[in-house]
Design a protein with these regions (language model features):
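Extended substrate/RNA-proximal surfaces in nucleic-acid metabolism proteins
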Residues: 2-88
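Charged catalytic cores and adjacent phosphate/nucleic-acid-binding surfaces used
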Residues: 26-38, 71-253
Length: 253
């Protein structure tokens, strides 16, 4: 099936990554995706830890799915903790469907994991997202191209950001760099004491900014003007970008 999908996907510019889900009881054990597998028939074992080891042995990158689903906290139960401690986990979902786990951003940073936002969709995207006026969740993979090799390299080096319902999550510097890649600043006028800039959002994503005053929405493909003392930089806290359980990046331009 994977080879058939990969052949058809070439006509649409889609990259199909072979994989398998390793699923057990969600509260006491958890759900995991094994990416870049070579033979799914060799993965299964009654022991979920051994199944994860089998996937890892064939070169798979394992992602921990929805770590807070059906749980009262995101703290890891025993089996899950063992999987982390053995180095079996390479990435983790900070968002799944409409769920967001800010505390998991800290885990990803501390353990060197890529972050992901996925739909876990069981219906059509139109019914679940577009009919509600929303875009589906996205994992932004900062890869050289969309080949399997480039995608894998980006995941291994944690070059991902997670996006869901207008919220971005990931590593602090990457969020800052992403914002600066989306936004341009142009000087309009300077009177020797103050400088006025035009600030443009060149992306299709919205940012929630807070400077020295009230937070405001910086909508896609719009501009605003900002005035600062000559020699000072523009500075905002990105309130819809999360780099930790209780932290947001601050950018200067």
């Amino acid at each position: 099936p994977v080879r058939l999908a990969q052949s058809a996907a070439q006509n649409y510019g889609i990259t199909v990554i072979p994989g398998a889900e390793i699923t057990r009881e969600p509260v006491s054990i958890g759900h995991f995706n094994a990416l870049f597998t070579t033979d799914n028939n060799l993965i299964y074992d009654r022991d979920p830890l051994q199944a994860l080891r089998n996937a890892k042995a064939q070169g798979a990158i394992i992602m921990h799915n929805h770590p807070g689903w059906r749980r009262t906290s995101v703290e890891s139960p025993e089996t899950e903790q063992k999987a982390y401690d053995e180095g079996l986990i390479g990435g983790v979902e900070t968002m799944n469907g409409s769920e967001f786990y800010p505390k998991i951003i800290d885990r990803a940073r501390e353990r060197g994991l890529f972050v992901a936002a996925n739909t876990d969709i069981h219906d059509s995207a139109t019914e679940t997202y577009r009919a509600q006026g929303q875009l589906r969740n996205m994992t932004l993979i900062l890869a050289a191209d969309n080949s399997i090799e480039a995608v894998r390299e980006a995941l291994e080096n944690r070059r991902t950001l997670a996006w869901s319902f207008g919220t971005l999550a990931g590593e602090e510097q990457m969020l800052k760099d992403f914002f600066k890649a989306c936004v341009s600043v142009r000087e309009i006028v300077s009177d020797g004491k103050y400088t006025t800039y035009a600030v443009t959002n060149n992306s299709s994503l919205e940012f929630m900014l807070q400077g020295s005053g009230t937070p405001f929405r910086f909508r896609p493909f719009t501009s605003f003007t900002a005035k600062v003392r000559k020699g000072e930089s523009l500075k905002w806290t990105l309130l819809n970008c999360w780099c930790g359980e209780n932290s947001h990046p601050v950018v200067e331009m």
